[in-house]
Amino acid sequence: MNMNGFDPFEWRSFYFPGMSREDAHKLLGEPRVSIGTFLMRDSSQPGEYSLSVREADEGNTVCHYLIVRDVKEDGTAGVKIAEQSFPDIPALLNHFKMRVLTEASLLSAYKKPIIEVVVGTFKFTGERETDLPFEQGERLEILSKTNNDWWEARNALGTTGLVPANYVQVQSGEFANERISKGTSQSSIGSSGNGAERFSSTSTSSENAEAHPTLPTTAKVTFDRVPNAYDPTQLRVKKGQTVRVLEKMSNGMYRAELDGQIGSVPFTYIRFNTANQ
């Protein structure tokens, strides 16, 4: 069991792409938020991330650290925070679980709130790296409904990923209400509805509006993606690039073009340019 309260490899479960520096500061600066609580978000610098951390109780101090892409002379890519380089984000987070940033180390991730509890009606083994496999009868926590076909979910182990909406059924009754209540309470941390619930609903509304744009159109890549080298149907993309989206495929992915190359990209890796819609 992870004694420090988070799994570095599941960083997207505490990544809030639409959150501003001011909102993160307000959220983590709540008096009830403990020292070492953190989240990840997009930086104001395009294509980069920020790590926001509650570091002290005095003044409800929240610090923000820029995480930038780091490309070596040999072409290998990693990430850098200040002058320290790491092969990837999980390695960076793991490093600061045991070491102090300014005044605190990373102790507990600020998790996304639960909006619904579902149970698997069929077994789902997963087809892509972004999928979350589950068993028939397994309970899952829904974090966002990106579109009508695929939802972002979290299992009992804290692993997050995408699940097909037609493979699950909403769990009703006292158990579901208790789980949603606990998830909201933990994530908003006593902020009287002004915390993560607000950010989550704003993000979900934005994503739903983008779910069915008029194609073809352009979209911004939100995550680096290096697909299997033996699968030529997948498109390799880097965060910050602009791709031309050609069509939506039956599996929920998009067929896109980048620098003359055409391949498929998961919808969670792109954000449509609303100006083109």
Curated annotation (Swiss-Prot):
SH3 domain sequence ranges: 113-173, 214-275
Subunit structure: Interacts with ced-5 (via C-terminus which contains a candidate SH3-binding, proline-rich region). Forms a ternary complex with ced-5 and ced-12. Interacts (via SH-2 domain) with src-1 (when activated and phosphorylated at 'Tyr-416').
DNA damage as UniProt keyword: no
Compositionally biased spans, kind Low complexity: 182-206
One cellular component term from this protein's GO annotations in UniProt: cytoplasm
Keyword ATP-binding in annotation: no
GO biological process, one term: positive regulation of engulfment of apoptotic cell
A GO term, aspect molecular function: receptor tyrosine kinase binding
Chain intervals for the UniProt region annotation (Disordered): 179-217
Function: Required for cell migration and engulfment of cell corpses but not for programmed cell death/apoptosis. Also has a role in the migration of the 2 gonadal distal tip cells (DTCs).
Name recorded for this polypeptide: Cell death abnormality protein 2
Keyword terms, alphabetized: Phagocytosis, Repeat, SH2 domain, SH3 domain
Organism: Caenorhabditis briggsae
InterPro entries with a match to the protein in the record: SH2, SH2_dom_sf, SH3-like_dom_sf, SH3_domain, Tyrosine-phos_adapter
Similarity comment: family membership: Belongs to the CRK family.
Domain SH2: 14-112
